[in-house]
Amino acid sequence: MNGGYAICAGLEQVIDYICNLKFEDDDIQYLNSLNKFSDKFLDYLKTFKFTGDIWAIPEGTVIFPNEPLLTVRAPIIEAQIIETMVLLLLNHQSLIATKSTRIVSAAKGSPVMEFGARRAHSIDAAVLGARAAVIGGCVGTSCTSTAQKFGTIASGTMAHSFVQSFDSEYDAFKAYAEVYPDDCTLLIDTYDTINSGVVNAIKVFNDVLLPKGYRPKAVRLDSGDLAYLSKKVRKILDENGFEDCKICVSNSLDENLITSLLEQGAKIDSFGVGENLITAKSDPVFGGVYKLSAIEKNGEIIPKIKISENVAKIINPGFKKVYRFYSKETEKALADVITLHDEQIPDNNYSIFDPENPWRKKALLNYYCKPLQEQILKNGELVYSLPNLESISKHCKDELNSLWDEVKRINNPHKYYVDLSQKLWDLKNDMLHKA
């Protein structure tokens, strides 16, 4: 994405897929009908089970370009069979989680709710996209299936069709308030926000809620000039004694529009974000790739490299690890370094350099570092404890707090260092020159 960082998401679904992958009789029959596969291969699929090892970066972790999010060490046929689903699941949810963090950041602490199910590209895109949005910081989702399945908050308000189905706007608001007196949020822009919507909302607050001892939760705006209308509505609510009534807005919001609204002094307490979040409309493709970087023969790991005229598509060879360095003084992330799997990181004084411009060097001092990947599967068996969605979301928040604000800027972010170890850089260049 066009930002300074990304968020890793989708690992839980990758694990579920790989651990439960098998080929049923009807799958074998279909593949046989294509007349493309040998009986030996089809017999192999009948008893297929993934038997390899997998290491991965946990969900909610901040990631950067060229870093190995997931490493598979397995018989090559097993590694290739899982490729498409691994990419699909990681790319999709990492995309939405990243977009979510940008939108949540723009909201400057005001709650953001995911409202995008009706604009998602499929059922799975709605359900898993909402999950990813919560990882990125959304406080809830209007997709009740996601809330039920993953234990997050189901949030939403009335629809315009609900208001239209009554003889009057007042009648609609009154009926809603009588059913939800303790959680009353009224949609006030169906007809005329200022001359009708907020007026009828206040009448219902006085006629229904106050006599029962309740206070209104919020009003919602879903159209029009949100900056102007929110200021007018705030003034009217305050003048009528409802200073505690929140204002929620929606309507094709994204991080840029939210930033603009707040810069204009809009009186907004929360945001409902739909299509621009659930589709990551501004940058709808996450470019994760799945490449062979080494093979193992007789216990020896032999590095491999893919070469391209496009420098960005030249992979880093070998069986790798990635480490993140933190300042002991500030606890902020300093740089990431990709190494070969058998390298050791010294306790202090580590020199990093720009892989594209190796004369640009920097000495890291007074740091601590940690490997980003954890082992997930060993010999095909799960050895990793899956965190719940709340824990993943908290981890994401902690990860973002470890970055300098300059790296998190929505526009023109500072470039975070992702460097290669000297050993890996030498290996890569040697292989390029010999190719």
Predicted features and spans:
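Glycine-rich phosphate/ribose-binding loops and adjacent secondary-structure elements
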Residues: S161-A333
